[in-house]
Amino acid sequence: MYSGAYSFVQISTAAYRISITRLEKTMESLQQQVAQLLEQQPTLLPAAMAEQLNVTEFDIVHALPEEMVAVVDGSHAQTILESLPEWGPVTTIMTIAGSIFEVKAPFPKGKVARGYYNLMGRDGELHGHLKLENISHVALVSKPFMGRESHYFGFFTAQGENAFKIYLGRDEKRELIPEQVARFKAMQQQHKQ
């Protein structure tokens, strides 16, 4: 009786290992495809790459070269958001049904109430209610945008969809704010360890 159960466990363990191996090979293949796209079309955004390769935007971001991204568990989303109000102006972007909404302002302070992280922006700043339990990953991405250095926080759902992005701010000359870049890179490095 026990030998049958033991055999089942062995078969289940073997099947699990095969599944993990297939997943690793698929990820490796996606990393190769992403590297090839980056080489051929360096200005292509992760969302466009995802569309071309028929995967989620998170799959693409997760497959970016290690020097371009740090991915953290969504449980860190609130901590990251709570740090942003002191960074100064940023650009928050939401893409909904093909439309792109942008808010260029300091990221507002927030507090948790009634199941949401509630943003309390001043006039002209972002307001809203974020369902942080729906954020499964946060990616700290460093990828040029329109030929210029660019860095952003991408907040992703369990389905791999991008909920919103927060890009580092730029000054009146359209240059990144050096203090923000330094903080971002330090945070990115911290989460790679």
UniProtKB/Swiss-Prot annotation:
Keyword NAD belongs to the record: no
The listed locations are:
Cytoplasm
Q: Which Gene3D superfamilies match?
A: HemS/ChuS/ChuX like domains
Domain of life (superkingdom):
Bacteria
**Main location class:** cytoplasm
Metal-binding listed as a keyword: yes
Q: Where do the annotations place heme binding?
A: Y116
Pfam families, per database record: ChuX_HutX
Enumerate the InterPro entries for this protein. Heme_Transport_Util_sf (IPR053733), HutX-like (IPR010413)
Keyword set for this entry?
Cytoplasm, Heme, Iron, Metal-binding
Q: Which GO terms label this protein's molecular function in UniProt? A: metal ion binding
Cite a GO CC annotation. Answer: cytoplasm
This chain's function reads: Binds heme. Heme is transferred to the heme-degrading enzyme HutZ via a specific protein-protein interaction.
Q: How does it assemble?
A: Homodimer. Interacts with HutZ.
- The protein's name in its UniProt record: Intracellular heme transport protein HutX
